[in-house]
Amino acid sequence: MNLEALCKEAGLSFYDDELVSENGRKIYRIYVQKEGGVNLDDCARLSEILSPIFDVESPVNGEYFLEVSSPGLERKLSKIEHFAKSIGELVKITTNEKEKFEAKIIAVDDENITLENLENKEKTTINFNDIKKARTFVEW
């Protein structure tokens, strides 16, 4: 099953997916984006496309709930493409060495991400594989 093609059919672009457990329930979440933003009708349309397909070819074992959503303003960055699409945005990063910092994404080149540290304004380049966790954030 090609989630990217199915999302495109609904006029959306696939961002990410995850399987989580909340209150003892398995939830399979699909995050999508669209120029101008994703609305409730977009999510419902994709859910209607996916539900009959998932009834035949389940993406997860056992019972689950399907959720279609926008990744939001403060979203997880788990692929190099996510960083490339987030140039100019603020990000909180935890490295594999458990170092934590906040920075602005300046550039992405292959597997390397150039960041400007928000504390000292120093520019640094980090390899994507050295990042354990990253999430965009908004300063209010």
From Swiss-Prot:
Subcellular location: Cytoplasm
The keyword Signal is assigned to this record: no
Predominant location category: cytoplasm
Record keyword Cytoplasm present: yes
Gene Ontology CC: one annotated term: cytosol
Gene3D superfamilies from the UniProt entry: Ribosome maturation factor RimP, C-terminal domain, RimP-like superfamily, N-terminal
Domain of life according to the entry: Bacteria
CDD domains: YlxS_C (cd01734)
Keywords attached to this entry: Cytoplasm, Ribosome biogenesis
GO biological process, one term: translation
InterPro entries assigned: Ribosome_maturation_RimP (IPR003728), RimP_C (IPR028998), RimP_C_sf (IPR036847), RimP_N (IPR028989), RimP_N_sf (IPR035956)
Family to which this protein belongs: Belongs to the RimP family.
Stated name of the protein: Ribosome maturation factor RimP
Organism, scientific name: Campylobacter jejuni subsp. jejuni serotype O:2 (strain ATCC 700819 / NCTC 11168)
